[in-house]
A protein has these predicted regions:
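Canonical Radical SAM [4Fe-4S] cluster-binding loop centered on the CxxxCxxC motif
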Residues: 1-39, 52
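Hydrophobic faces of well-ordered beta-strands that scaffold small-molecule active sites
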Residues: 5-9, 57-59, 84-86, 106-108, ...
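Disulfide-bonded cysteines in secreted/extracellular proteins and peptides
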Residues: 15, 19-22, 230, 238, ...
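Short loop/turn motifs at secondary-structure junctions
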Residues: 18, 53, 80, 102, ...
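Canonical radical SAM enzyme core domain
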Residues: 29-43, 64-105, 109-130, 151-166, ...
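Short Fe-S-cluster ligation motifs
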Residues: 43-61
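Radical SAM enzyme [4Fe-4S]-AdoMet core and its adjacent flexible, acidic
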Residues: 116, 120-121, 126-132, 136, ...
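Flexible mid-to-C-terminal extensions adjoining Fe-S/redox cofactors in radical SAM and related proteins
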Residues: 233-290
């Protein structure tokens, strides 16, 4: 399977949850200045598609829906013919029809179907049943939306196959897919290896249908599940390039805390597409002109 690459736009460093394992996409700090506009994101989408054929963008954070420019940025990105995935905890979705009008895919964090465990993981008192209601509402408004329920597997909290099964079944009911993610943590006691997550799915009767360097895909009758490797985890650090994080100050990163970074703010603000391209192609070798 040919690897695909994209920009992962960290639109805001802020989040209303406090998940204890959060790696902050792009290794971004809450003090990071918000220097990019919706128009800037439209330029980035256009450049990525024109130069390298990157026709998808993932918007993440922080919690992307905290950002006041989220919807306008989505509109301008979509106008460039680029498909949008939003990664969200779904607690701020007041109107799914308006918020996700420009999305092709929504990935919702749902690490458990147990409200007590959910509160422990997220550090939030936001009710789990409201998140579940939001997932159902998204599906009702967008019957063709790709819907992933992201489940970070944590030892001693939600690594039991029966707990995984509950999210798999709910995902199936809303015509979505459960996506299990290995934990990025220096505390090895709570890390469940990718191979163990795969073993759990096989025990639940799934069969592996395909895989690449970062993901494996499984099926069981009409149900589907995915395991994806977290690019921030030490055990996956030698797997090469995947995606390019763009922080709201114009800094790009491949996500590693020790990663050399470079800033594209000037090139973005000046709409200098050639300068933009040269910096990215130097920094991110998989970026090949089409």
């Amino acid at each position: 399977m040919k690897e695909k690459h994209e920009f992962r736009i960290v639109i805001t460093p802020f989040c209303n949850y406090r998940c204890f394992f959060c790696h902050s996409e792009g290794v971004i700090e809450e003090c990071t200045p918000l220097l990019l506009t919706p128009q800037d994101y439209g330029f980035i989408a256009k450049a990525g598609k024109k130069l390298w054929g990157w026709d998808t963008i993932t918007i993440t954070g922080g919690e992307p829906l905290v950002s006041p420019i989220y919807r306008e940025a989505c509109e301008l990105i979509a106008k460039e013919g680029v498909r949008i995935t939003t990664v969200t905890n779904a607690s701020l979705v007041s109107s799914p029809k308006k918020i996700f009008a420009y999305n092709s895919q929504v990935n919702i964090f749902l690490h458990t179907m147990d409200p007590v465990i959910y509160e422990k993981i997220t550090g939030s008192s936001y009710p789990l049943d409201r998140v579940i209601d939001t997932v159902i509402a998204i599906r009702s408004y967008f019957p063709n939306m790709i819907l992933h329920l992201n489940y970070t597997v944590i030892r001693g909290m939600n690594d039991d196959p029966l707990e995984m099964e509950k999210v798999i079944r709910f995902a199936s009911r809303v015509d979505g897919e459960a996506k299990f993610i290995d934990l990025a943590s220096t505390n090895k006691k709570i890390v469940v290896p990718y191979e163990e997550i795969e073993k759990n799915l096989l025990l639940l009767g799934f069969e592996k249908t395909k895989s690449d360097n970062w993901q494996s895909f499984f099926s069981r009758a009409d149900e589907k599940a995915i395991i994806t490797r977290c690019g921030f985890s030490e055990q996956n650090s030698n797997r090469g390039y995947r995606n390019l994080f763009l922080n709201p100050d114009g800094m790009i990163s491949n996500g590693s805390g020790s990663d050399l970074r470079t800033n594209l703010l000037l090139e973005i603000h000046e709409r200098n597409i050639e300068g933009f391209a040269k910096k990215i192609e130097w920094y991110f070798p998989p970026a090949k002109r089409i």
